[in-house]
Amino acid sequence: QMCIRDRSYTCRQVIDRLHRFYTQRKVQPYGHYAASAAGGDEMDEARERLAAIMNVATDELSFGPSTSQNTYVLAQAFAETLQQGDAVIVTDQDHEANSGAWRRLANRGMEIREWHVDPESGQLELDSLAAILDEKVKLVCFPHCSNIVGQENPVARIVAMAHDVGAVTCVDGVSMAPHGFPDIGALGTDIYLFSSYKTYGPHQGIMVVRQDLADRLANQAHFFNADARVKRFTPAGPDHAQVAAAAGMADYVDALYAHHVGGDADPAARARVVTAMK
């Protein structure tokens, strides 16, 4: 027999919320009648609860169709913000979602620097990063965890190194988030990306962009959404039902915490306890 380990299935809490939205809320949300208002409230609930779990502000979390598409939108925002000659660091430990879009910035006059893995271990070494890190670097992109060699990279240390030269960081958490929700506040990264369908949720990309950076990057949405952080990097309308259903991911964390531990704790603390169960 062959045992194949794939992504997580969607939890019942998400499925129930998705079903409820499609059968009771399938109208334009945020209107002034019951079904519309309830739909908007459920979308807001998902953002608020997931942001609390990850220890970030509510308006720092955005939803998109996938992590790959979120990254392409961010790359376009950086392309309109960076200057020719600015440097961007990418790795060969990343999968394409967090490297291809950034490498294309070379077509806009940015310098792309490669942080190569050790050829024997497949790991990213901090000394190798230090050798290519200077004040020309404006963005450092790297994975939280490699889905090939399984290395969990020291995110907080890498972020500190990047910040020391004035660069911001973009962490691909697609391979890490299935093992537990990240405490992004503690990690300190400027951008964190992962896919909710690999974390018991609907097929959405979840993108955290910290407030200061979000306000500096070029708006990618309609001009009338430019002042709304949760809309700046969502060029098209969101999938209302899937965004609302993402609150079921928080329901699932709460259910696991209540069953195994119980008692009072803030959302981020509950998520840390559930993550430790892995």
Would you name each region that the model predicts?
Residues 1, 5-278:
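Pyridoxal 5′-phosphate
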